[in-house]
């Protein structure tokens, strides 16, 4: 069983606490993106990043000095968004950390696909960003089916805990025989069950921790998840989507 998650915009460096396992599988393609980013001026990058001046300045300076071989942080420790705070990889048990290194993958606009303990450097490039590299105008075009091919190299079950922006890079290439399970986290609002972005990020992080720390390997075991009021609801679920409702 493999688990996929989204990255986070907010990143940190921690080159001392944990060892990296290897470099990203698509580091060469990340180098192409880095060269492209370095060819842009400040205003062009700010437009690509769609952010304020403070964030643009931080990331512009990062791009100028970026080296994909030095001062690397394990990927799962490098992001610090809501999902990662809920996941708490810094305090994983040793067994959960080993399982993460083997089965947890992060889909990235810049690196393509990352193993949890792959060594990376802070960057900013969302999957929905527009690019102009050869005849490619989106990162979905740039990555093509390479992320999908790497993820399904072993034909394993994939549990999707990524947002649509990132899972889209895989879902468009899925074949009928591919095992791809979506986990959705919803709560009632005005008589309807809806997924709220912030609450879903928190729940996805909780689910990752639940799977890793309980060494879960089967879909039926995932259904036992009950954290922060969420319960599996079979009446809303299908063969390809597990729906959890917060009461």
From Swiss-Prot:
InterPro entries: YaaA. GO terms for cellular component: cytosol. GO terms for biological process: response to hydroperoxide. It comes from the Bacteria. Belongs to the UPF0246 family. HAMAP family: UPF0246. PANTHER family: PEROXIDE STRESS RESISTANCE PROTEIN YAAA (PTHR30283:SF4), PEROXIDE STRESS RESPONSE PROTEIN YAAA (PTHR30283). This is UPF0246 protein LSL_1719. It comes from Ligilactobacillus salivarius (strain UCC118). The lineage of its organism: Bacteria, Bacillati, Bacillota, Bacilli, Lactobacillales.
């Amino acid at each position: 069983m493999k688990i996929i998650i989204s990255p986070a915009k907010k990143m940190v460096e921690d080159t001392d606490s944990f060892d990296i396992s290897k470099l990203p599988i698509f580091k060469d393609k990340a180098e192409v993106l880095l060269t492209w980013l370095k060819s842009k001026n400040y205003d062009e990058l700010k437009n690509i990043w769609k952010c304020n001046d403070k964030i643009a300045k931080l990331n512009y300076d990062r791009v100028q000095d970026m080296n994909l071989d030095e001062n690397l942080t394990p990927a799962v420790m490098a992001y610090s968004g809501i999902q990662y705070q809920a996941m708490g990889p810094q305090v994983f048990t040793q067994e959960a950390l080993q399982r993460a290194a083997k089965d947890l993958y992060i889909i990235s606009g810049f690196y393509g696909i990352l193993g949890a303990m792959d060594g990376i450097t802070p960057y900013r490039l969302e999957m929905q960003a527009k690019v102009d590299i050869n005849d490619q105008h989106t990162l979905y075009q740039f990555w093509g089916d390479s992320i999908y091919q790497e993820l399904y190299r072993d034909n394993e079950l994939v549990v999707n805990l990524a947002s649509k922006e990132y899972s889209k890079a895989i879902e468009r290439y899925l074949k009928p025989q591919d095992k791809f399970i979506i986990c959705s986290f919803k709560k009632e609002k005005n008589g309807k069950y809806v997924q709220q972005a912030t609450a879903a990020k928190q729940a996805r992080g909780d689910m990752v921790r639940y799977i890793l720390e309980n060494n879960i390997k089967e879909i039926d075991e995932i259904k036992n998840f009950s954290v922060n009021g969420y319960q599996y609801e079979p009446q809303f679920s299908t063969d390809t989507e597990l729906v959890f409702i917060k009461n």
